[in-house]
Regions:
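P-loop/Walker A phosphate-binding loop and immediately adjacent motor/lid segment at beta-alpha junctions
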Residues: 23-32, 52-53, 176-183, 189, ...
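Nucleotide phosphate-binding/pyrophosphate-handling subdomain across enzymes
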Residues: 94-215
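Acidic-glycine-rich active-site phosphate/pyrophosphate-binding loop
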Residues: 75-101
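Short internal beta-strands
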Residues: 34-38, 188-191, 214-221
Length: 237
């Protein structure tokens, strides 16, 4: 649960956003499962209000929530020694190496690894066998065909183009972390602001962009979501 959509429809802070998102897991049947991020304090608090089974995922296998949960026999998905791993109590089952999963872009896109952990855990809880989980992980490609606008990378002779619809600070930070692992002479960003986000969010996205790119081109979309182009560009600048 990260800062996005704040300032919209009476959602003013992360506590408000957490209450809205909790509606989904609070609707799960008693014999069903809620898959929650063990590293997010809001998710951990939400877990206390649920009447269903709970499973956690984390990039850190030593996370206190994971350790305590599994000590009680709970089920979790962890990123362990480069592997997507299911953990139940003291028992571990490695599902796949992250570098073998295209969505992780060679294991460099950490936020994608976290997404894979959640999806793998949900699949395991649903009853899928390990091989039936591995197959789609190995064949689901971040591309215009399968994930349009999400980490789409196009290879040209002397350069690469990556397209991603990151539009909040958390998304920009994820891209920044990934780009730090990319060896490139120049990193040129074409960015835009999202008009229905708070001033502070647009300004923070611009600051992150300034850190991760050598050159920046500002290009606004036609749908400005309630602001003028000049206003958005002013906040970015």
């Amino acid at each position: 649960i990260q800062e996005d959509h704040l300032g919209l429809n009476d959602i003013h802070d992360l506590n408000d956003l957490a209450r809205v998102k909790s509606v989904i897991v609070k609707s799960v049947k008693k014999d069903g499962w809620a898959v929650l991020n063990a590293e997010d304090k809001h998710c951990v608090e939400i877990a206390k209000e649920l009447n269903c089974n709970i499973a956690y995922f984390s990039m850190n296998e030593h996370c206190d929530v994971i350790v305590n949960h599994c000590r009680k026999g709970g089920i979790a998905a962890i990123y362990e020694n480069g592997f997507i791993t299911i953990k139940k109590g003291d028992w571990k089952m490695r599902v796949e190496k992250a570098t073998h999963i295209p969505l992780t872009l060679g294991g460099k896109a950490k936020f994608m690894i976290a997404n894979v952990l959640a999806a793998t855990l949900a699949s395991y809880l649903w009853g899928f066998k390990t091989e039936d989980i591995k197959a789609p992980l190995e064949t689901f490609i971040p591309s215009a065909a399968q994930t349009p606008g999400r980490m789409n990378i196009f290879n040209f002779k002397n350069f690469k183009v990556m397209i991603d619809f990151a539009h909040n600070p958390a998304g920009y930070l994820g891209i920044e972390d990934f780009l730090q692992s990319v060896d490139a002479t120049n990193k040129i960003g074409i960015i835009a602001g999202v008009g229905d986000r708070r001033d502070s969010d647009i300004i923070e996205c611009a600051a992150i962009a300034a850190r991760m790119f050598n050159h920046i081109v500002i290009r606004q979309e036609k749908h400005l979501r309630g602001r003028t182009e000049e206003e958005i560009i002013g906040l970015i600048m």
